[in-house]
Amino acid sequence: MNINNITISAVRPRTSILDKSLSKGKGEVSLSCYALLFSELVQYCQNRVYTVPELQTKLTEMGAEVGHRMTDLLIMREKGGKREIKLLNVLLFIKSTLWKSLFGREADKLEHANDDERTYYIIEKESLVNKFVSVPKDKGSLNCASFVAGIVEAVLCDSGFVRNFF
């Protein structure tokens, strides 16, 4: 009796990143990698400016670039291409969906100011962008959260709100 073994193997075709769906996968980046990347971004900006306000402006501009891209990606992924047009809904989108995508968790609070009906605060008790950056004494007023402010500004601008932030 002669038994032949037949082996069939399926060879997966190689797919490029352009072939993957936008709705697939939410990649995670390690905290140490994120910290290194962000500290290098701050150093890059620091080497190209002379004052702390210029540095914060540069970080805000870079954050805005991230914000525009994240808005497009998350709107396609989460909302099926439909953008929110009401302020509170956009702010809740930023607090939850955007924050989870960027920092792995929601922002701690979204508060409405008592004295001004047009002022809202997104509160994060321990900001990831300030956690791993040591500020030199000569740049004591530097707040690296201006990067995140740029992201929020871009999302609000992309949602059709007038640029009158901060």
Language-model-detected regions and their locations in the chain:
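C-terminal non-catalytic interaction appendages of large macromolecular assemblies
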Residues: 129, 138-166
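N-terminal accessory segment detector
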Residues: 1-142
